[in-house]
């Protein structure tokens, strides 16, 4: 029985709502880009967006490798046995899962470790219509990369300061940190080319689970690592969606990006 963080992320449903909202936009201004920005120059808007999407894919793959390691670990097996032994029967287990998956409050509680942003992924179409504008998309990406750039530096410093702890996964975190830093620079360049702005965006709270990563309790530390991986999955999934839409608007046209075909392909 796999752990829950190996299952599809609930943020996918939220992103579908964003797509639905995009289909409702009737008048969307294109990004202020020149017609010469569609060549193979890596510093053009096309080159930056293509490179950013490659980085996003690489980060996703590395994070999936972390989750694979967590899933097959001894601690994962111990937690599964502990949970199953606490259930009096399979019926009670099934009932628990139904209740858990059906309670938005419980799902929200499990995400309290994740970064908080002033502009968040909408929870419904009505909220989406009132929250997101095209100009916000590069800022939404930038804020997430800034948050993770800081978080991963702190996470790596903790591991390096405690030899023998998480040595097997530290190289993966360092690789992710490098690619996050690259994606952060790409995001700044995209924002600069699109709107002439390059400043940092103070739009996030620090990840609140660092203390648990320092815990002497192995179970607490393991669960904190799982939550860190899940939060990264949510934000990279969100950033990748925004990159795809920005690329479509910048290199194709607004009408095509907002067509029903684009929505279905997403």
Curated annotation (Swiss-Prot):
Name of this chain's protein: Prolactin-7A1
CDD domains (alphabetical): prolactin_like
Location of the protein in the cell: Secreted
Source organism per UniProt: Mus musculus (Mouse)
Domain of life of the native organism: Eukaryota
Claim: Transcription regulation is one of the keywords in the record: no
Gene: Prl7a1
A Pfam family that the UniProt record links to this protein: Hormone_1
Keyword set, alphabetical order: Disulfide bond, Glycoprotein, Hormone, Secreted, Signal
Keyword Signal: yes
